């Protein structure tokens, strides 16, 4: 299942500006601990480019969200309201693309834009994940397309 996170963010901006403004202006902490690797990051759920205001990244993974003990008390309820509104948009079947991957199928996506999930599965399967740094990706792209 795939959801265009930028589309969902734009829909939130149009339907609930207060929630949109909250999710673009508050930095949230994220942590992932596999036992072998501990990753920490922070940033707004919806990140806008500081130069032109376009969407640059969606951070939306409830499993990696750290405790909210750094938020002001009065902001906790606002955070959860905004998160509920954004979640409702992403959970709307009209905003989701569902498909079944066949064996040998490769799926490449922009992880900063495309939200992804899956449903239950019975039987055997093997999934392999691979991540490419956006700095590396765009650096190589710029080098390959640079006109001297």
Name each model-derived stretch.
Residues 1-148:
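Active-site environment of non-heme Fe oxygenases that use a 2-His-1-carboxylate facial triad
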């Amino acid at each position: 299942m795939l959801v265009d996170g930028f589309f969902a963010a734009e829909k939130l901006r149009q339907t609930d500006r207060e929630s949109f403004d909250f999710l673009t202006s508050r930095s949230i902490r994220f942590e992932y601990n596999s036992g072998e690797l501990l990753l920490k990051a922070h940033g707004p759920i919806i990140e806008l480019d500081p130069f032109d205001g376009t969407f640059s990244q969606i951070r939306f993974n409830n499993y990696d969200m750290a405790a909210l003990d750094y938020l002001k008390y009065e902001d906790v309820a606002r955070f959860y309201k905004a998160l509920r509104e954004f979640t409702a948009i992403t959970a709307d079947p009209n905003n989701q693309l569902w498909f079944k991957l066949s064996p040998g199928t490769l799926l490449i996506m922009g992880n900063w834009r495309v939200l992804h999930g899956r449903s239950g599965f019975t039987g055997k399967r093997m999934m392999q994940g691979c991540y490419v740094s956006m700095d590396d990706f765009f650096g190589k792209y710029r080098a390959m397309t640079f006109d001297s």
